[in-house]
Structure formats: structure tokens, C-alpha cells
């Protein structure tokens, strides 16, 4: 039976994390390796799907490894092809979510089918819908999609005991950047504004180091490493490590032996990257985060001096230059009370607790990050809902026809901030037909936008004259139909079963190898201690198991393993009994010797002694 608990998942670009409410506090669930975060990496090898640390470790040698898929979620037409099979970003994300779901279930000891999943605050509707689809494919009922900065504010605010304050959350992750301004007080978490860049994060900082290394190596050796896939993967790993090292030390050594080969033989890469050089390489990336901070403050109607706390979120906020920049822009020393890698998952778990009723007196008021509207005459974008409007929300406006006797109107739904429709993102199109013939401007067409608590959009158009209505729920522009999602769910389940079966096979083979080793050792220990018939029986059973192993007959291996286990167990009991008997005999012998010793004492001769003074002769 499924648990009533709702897990909180931070589905990150480079790393993911999961948490659950434990009493009145959220708690991170560690993965099978014991780590608190899991690399968002999927690899395909020999028909097997690997996720997390094990997938990341073999990325250098396996070209069928997918990382940072979150950067493409909701992207129309984007697919990754491995061994002739294409995967959408939703499917790859679902593999990560399935893995997280499985180890969360192992931790809780019960099935989990409900989750709160976080997304960057600046994700548009199609990206949110695609994230929800990924959860569904993984077998999760996604109860809520919440924004990452909002989630981290929940993790922070839970310990503030209802204190009234305005906070700015600066969230720089592996692939996305968000900034949100919130007002906290009496258990109410109200988002005042949000801004960001969905294509800016730690990956971009890594890329700056990679580009620098490629340029330096080309200058030194005349070889372009950017054309070598395996070398690039090694460079990526080295760049990520150097970036992390430079958060704690002033220079990082980058050493990659045998990175390539030239006419004279193997070539090695040896470089020292100082923090000053790194800051110079990435200065433009840090600067790109400034405008969103200023815009978020402006939209919230606040100045930097009115912010009480600045919360840093995301692994990339460990970069000293980022921390210094935020301090300069806000005039505040950033608050380091929450772990930037874990806060989002913890906050998602709090939201899960709110939904189940385990967390009381917490109200979350989030906002839509981008304006929503439709295309009107002349290709103009007419907004119906402005950005930073608190959700859920609903807004309607009446439009009319642009031509006489127009029988239908096309509703082109858009999201963005640009004045012209062509410059904004299309969320969907639908048509309201059978409009009665009338001069232009006469028909009354009411267009209504609804945004639900997940930030997902529903649009309807109604002819007020006839009452005829047409509705659309905006689907992800990556175009997954319900049938496709159902098919992917089925495939994910089948893969899960196949992976489970494969693991059982590996476990069985390991158990067989171990049993054969144990049998050989036991038989050696029993030489001359049990009858030849018993030894032969064990050897025959061992040979039967070895034959089943050689024939790769799994059913026979199971049966023969059980047979041999019983025989070896019986022999081991005999060996143990013999050892006990030998100990008993030894103890009896010791007692007998003790008796003899006592008898000897009776014949002891008492002698006289005289104390001699060694100095007597010298006196």
C-alpha cells in the first residue's frame, strides 16, 4: 500500500535531492551511496540504464551518457538518441525521478506515489508541464509544482518563528538562475516578485574553464581538444573540480596526463588556474545576474536597503565572486544558515507536509513569472495577466472580430514581456468557430485565463452572443499527448522490472560464487573428520551447481544452490560440534592434570633456611 507521505524533490540540472517530513522537520533522504545529493546523470550500457553517481563515474568512457537534461525540458522537438532509440527530456528526467522514488521507498519502507517537485521560478508554462509529465512517467502523482526560490524560503522560514521580514533569494544552480523577493510573517510566505535566466548556471562557469583549457592546450601543442569527445569529458570533470576547489583555495592544479597524442608521442595537460583568473573568465556570467536582481526588487516595489535577509541557494553560490557581487548589490552579508544544495528539497518536503496537513499554519502565495496574453490585430501581444501576479488567479477580457462576417477567431496564447506577439513564446493555439455573421466589432468574444496553483495555464473563449465556448489546457510545447505519456509510463515500468530482474541475476551469481568458495573451504577443513560418503555428497552437489552456472540456467542455479547450501550447513554444524567436543575433552584433561598436581603437593619436603648478611665479612 502506498504511503500517504508526499516527498519533496529538487530535480536539478547537475544534482537532485529528495526530502520528507520527519515529525515537524524536513529531512534529506540519502541515496544508496550515502550521499545527500544525486548527480542528474543517466547512462546506457549493455542494455542497462544507470542513474546518479555510477552513471557520472563512467561518463568519460561511455558516450551514451546524458547530463544536464533539464536545460532542454519543455523544448519542442528535442530528443536524445541512444542505440537507435530516441528519448525526450521528460523520459530522461523520469529515469532520474524513478531512481529517487525507489531509494526514498527503501528509506521509508513503503511505496511512495506522491511528490512535490520544484522548478526554476522563471520556467515557462511548457517547462512546468513537461516537469509534471516527467513525474507522471516515473509513476508519481505530482501534487504541486513549486518554484525553487520559494521552496528554499520555506526551508529558511520554518525556523523563524513567524518573524516578519522581507527576504531576497538568489538561486544560482547548475543550469538556471532565479531571484525572488518574498515577504514572510505569521506563517504566510508571499512572493512579491521573481526574475531570472533559465539558461545560466554552474555549467556555464565550467564551460569558461573548458574553453580556456582548450585554448591554452592549442597554443602549447597545436592540438584542438574540442574535437575529441573523450578529452572533452575529461576536461569537463577537471573544470568542475577546479571550480569547486577555487571556492576554498586561491589556485587549482589541473593535471590530465595522456589527454592526447602528437607526432612525438603522448601529450599531457598541466595547468594552474588561479582564483583571479577564474574570476576574470567568468566576470560576464556574474554580471548577467545583476539585472534580474534589480528587476526583482523594482517589481516588488522595494529598495535593497528594505531587504532584511539575502538567502543564497544553489551550489554555484559557493563561488566567492558571486557572494561578493551579491553583497555589493544588496548591501547585505548573505545569510548562510541553510545548505544551498539541500534547501530546495527541504522546502519541497515542507510544502508536501502542508498538503498532507502535517505542517500547520503555513500559507504559500506564489506568483506567475511571466505575463500571459493573446495576439491581437497587427501582431500585438495583449497581456491579460501581468507577471508577478499571485497564483492561482483568473482574468478575462472581451475582444471582437477584425473583419465583417468573420465566422471564426484564432486564439493565439502567448507568454512573455515583449510588445509584439512574434517575440514572445507561443503556449498554444485554438479556434472558436460558428460565430454568427455580423459587422466587425459587434461579436463579443470573452477570453478567460486561469492559472492553477502549479502555474499551469487554462484558456477559454466564449461567444457571449451564443454562449458557445472553446477551452484549451496548455500542454507542453514538447508535444507529449496523454497516449505518449501512458506509453512512456508503461516502458518505464517495464524497464524497472527488467532492471530488478537483472539485479536479482547478478545477486544470484554472486551468491553462487560465494557458496562454491565456502564449500571448498569447508571440505578442506573437514578432511579426515567426516565420512567419505558425506564428502562425496557435498562434492557432487557442488559440481551440479557449477554445471548449472556454466549452462547459465538460472532456475537450476537457484535449486542447486539451495541443495548445496543445506549440505554445507549440515557439514558446518558437524564441524562445530566436533570442535565443541574437542574443547570438552581438553577441559576434562586439564582437570585431571590439576588433580595430579595436588597429589604431588602432599609429598613436598619442608626445608630450613638461614638469612645471610652479605656485608658480614666486611664489618
From Swiss-Prot:
Residue stretches of biased makeup (Low complexity): 579-596
Q: Key word Acyltransferase present in the record?
A: no
Tell me which stretches of the chain form a coiled coil. none
Question: Pfam families, from UniProt?
Answer: HSP70
A single Gene Ontology MF term assigned here is: ATP binding
Which key words are in the record? ATP-binding, Chaperone, Nucleotide-binding, Phosphoprotein, Stress response
Region: Disordered; residue ranges are 579-619
Explain what induces or represses this protein's expression: By stress conditions e.g. heat shock.
Q: Which residues carry this modification: Phosphothreonine?
A: 176
Name the Gene3D superfamilies on file: 1.20.1270.10, 3.30.420.40, Actin, Chain A, domain 4, Substrate Binding Domain Of DNAk, Chain A, domain 1
InterPro entries per record: ATPase_NBD (IPR043129), Chaperone_DnaK (IPR012725), Heat_shock_70_CS (IPR018181), HSP70_C_sf (IPR029048), HSP70_peptide-bd_sf (IPR029047), Hsp_70_fam (IPR013126)
Write down what this protein is called: Chaperone protein DnaK
Species of origin reads Pediococcus pentosaceus (strain ATCC 25745 / CCUG 21536 / LMG 10740 / 183-1w)
Amino acid at each position: 500500500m502506498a504511503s500517504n507521505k508526499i516527498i519533496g524533490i529538487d530535480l536539478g540540472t547537475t544534482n537532485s535531492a529528495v526530502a520528507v517530513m520527519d515529525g515537524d522537520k524536513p529531512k534529506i533522504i540519502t541515496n544508496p551511496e550515502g550521499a545527500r545529493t544525486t548527480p542528474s546523470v543517466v547512462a546506457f550500457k549493455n542494455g542497462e540504464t544507470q542513474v546518479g553517481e555510477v552513471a557520472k563515474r563512467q561518463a568519460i568512457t561511455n558516450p551514451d551518457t546524458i547530463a544536464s537534461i533539464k536545460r532542454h525540458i519543455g523544448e519542442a522537438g528535442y530528443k536524445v538518441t541512444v542505440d537507435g532509440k530516441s528519448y525526450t527530456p521528460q523520459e530522461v528526467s523520469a529515469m532520474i525521478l524513478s531512481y529517487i522514488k525507489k531509494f526514498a521507498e527503501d528509506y521509508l519502507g513503503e511505496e511512495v506515489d506522491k511528490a512535490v517537485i520544484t522548478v526554476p521560478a522563471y520556467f515557462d508554462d511548457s517547462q512546468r508541464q513537461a516537469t509534471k509529465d516527467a513525474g507522471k512517467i516515473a509513476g508519481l502523482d505530482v501534487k504541486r509544482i513549486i518554484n525553487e526560490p520559494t521552496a528554499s524560503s520555506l526551508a529558511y522560514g520554518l525556523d523563524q518563528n513567524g518573524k516578519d521580514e522581507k527576504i531576497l533569494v538568489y538561486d544560482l544552480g547548475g543550469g538556471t538562475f532565479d531571484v525572488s523577493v518574498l515577504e514572510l510573517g505569521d506563517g504566510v510566505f508571499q512572493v512579491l516578485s521573481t526574475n531570472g535566466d533559465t539558461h545560466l548556471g554552474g555549467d556555464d562557469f565550467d564551460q569558461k574553464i573548458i574553453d580556456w583549457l582548450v585554448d591554452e592546450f592549442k597554443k602549447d601543442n597545436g592540438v584542438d581538444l574540442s574535437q575529441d569527445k573523450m578529452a572533452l569529458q575529461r576536461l569537463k570533470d577537471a573544470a568542475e573540480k577546479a571550480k569547486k576547489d577555487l571556492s576554498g583555495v586561491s589556485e587549482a592544479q589541473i593535471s590530465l596526463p595522456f589527454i592526447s597524442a602528437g607526432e612525438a608521442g603522448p601529450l599531457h595537460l598541466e595547468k594552474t588556474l588561479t582564483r583571479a583568473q577564474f574570476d576574470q573568465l567568468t566576470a560576464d556570467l556574474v554580471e548577467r545576474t545583476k539585472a534580474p536582481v534589480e528587476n526583482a526588487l523594482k517589481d516588488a516595489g522595494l529598495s535593497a536597503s528594505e531587504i532584511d535577509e539575502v538567502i543564497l541557494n544553489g551550489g554555484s553560490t559557493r563561488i566567492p565572486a558571486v557572494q561578493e557581487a551579491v553583497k555589493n548589490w544588496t548591501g547585505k552579508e548573505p545569510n548562510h544558515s541553510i545548505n544551498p544544495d539541500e534547501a530546495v528539497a527541504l522546502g519541497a518536503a515542507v510544502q508536501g507536509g502542508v498538503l498532507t496537513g502535517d505542517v500547520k499554519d503555513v500559507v504559500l502565495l506564489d506568483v506567475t513569472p511571466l505575463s500571459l496574453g493573446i495576439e491581437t490585430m497587427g501582431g500585438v501581444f495583449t497581456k491579460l495577466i501581468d507577471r508577478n501576479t499571485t497564483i492561482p488567479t483568473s482574468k478575462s477580457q472581451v475582444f471582437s472580430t477584425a473583419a465583417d462576417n468573420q465566422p471564426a477567431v484564432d486564439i493565439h496564447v502567448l507568454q512573455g514581456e515583449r510588445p509584439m506577439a512574434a517575440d514572445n513564446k507561443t503556449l498554444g493555439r485554438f479556434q472558436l468557430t460558428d460565430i454568427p455573421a455580423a459587422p466587425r466589432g459587434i461579436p463579443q468574444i470573452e477570453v478567460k485565463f486561469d492559472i492553477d496553483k502549479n502555474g499551469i495555464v487554462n484558456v477559454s473563449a466564449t461567444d457571449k452572443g451564443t454562449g458557445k465556448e472553446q477551452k484549451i489546457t496548455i500542454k507542453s510545447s514538447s508535444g507529449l499527448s496523454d497516449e505518449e505519456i501512458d506509453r512512456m509510463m508503461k516502458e518505464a515500468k517495464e524497464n524497472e522490472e527488467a532492471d530488478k530482474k537483472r539485479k536479482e541475476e547478478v545477486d544470484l551469481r554472486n551468491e553462487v560464487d560465494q557458496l562454491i568458495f565456502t564449500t571448498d573451504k569447508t571440505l578442506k577443513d573437514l578432511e579426515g573428520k567426516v565420512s567419505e560418503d558425506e564428502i562425496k555428497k557435498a562434492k557432487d552437489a557442488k559440481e551440479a551447481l557449477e554445471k548449472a552456472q556454466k549452462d547459465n540456467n538460472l532456475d537450476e542455479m537457484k535449486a542447486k544452490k539451495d541443495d548445496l547450501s543445506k549440505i554445507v550447513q549440515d557439514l558446518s554444524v558437524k564441524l562445530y560440534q566436533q570442535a565443541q567436543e574437542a574443547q570438552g575433552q581438553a577441559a576434562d584433561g586439564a582437570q585431571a592434570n590439576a588433580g595430579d598436581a595436588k597429589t604431588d603437593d602432599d609429598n613436598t619436603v619442608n626445608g630450613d633456611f638461614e638469612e645471610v648478611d652479605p656485608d658480614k665479612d666486611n664489618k
